[in-house]
Amino acid sequence: MYQLVIAEKPSVAQGLAAVLGAGQRREGYLEGNGWLVSWCVGHLAELADAAAYDPAYAKWRKEDLPILPEHWKFTISPDKRDQFDTLRTLLRREDVAEVVNACDAGREGELIFRTVYALAGCSKPISRLWISSMEDEAIREGFTHLRPGREYDGLHQAALCRSKADWLCLFYTSDAADDMQ
């Protein structure tokens, strides 16, 4: 069985893989020593724009307000689709027993990982790597002290809430400003 490690950036994934002994390069990930190590390339998926909810919202109109999605939708950047597909395949592999969230230690890293995890339809156990240094010893120490992913549920919810608030504010203010010009 494998443990799948998902980092936020390819460079971080390569550093982690080197310490873990996952040196075999594959398409979109590294493998070896019981580990699969991949990456998100930053925000692979983001909240969809208003037109995804209703084509009428493509043009800002005061009459349409407020736009408050009941179920939020996400889009995947076309230039990042291949990497998302790789992650989804890895997350769904039957020989993957656990997923390690190795995205950046913080609110955005938590959001990036959890969004991909959810969109992939994964329900495997999550552990959290929380490190602030890419020194080999710090990486080893971090993997020795992995924490259950559920301990970061609040951080994820805070990040998701902030992201939705940003979406609402950006939609209302930027489109209104464009419309006034």
Language-model regions, residue ranges each:
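Single conserved hydrophobic/aromatic residue that forms the stacking wall/gate
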Residues: Y172-Q181
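Intrinsically disordered, low-complexity regulatory segments
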Residues: M1-F171
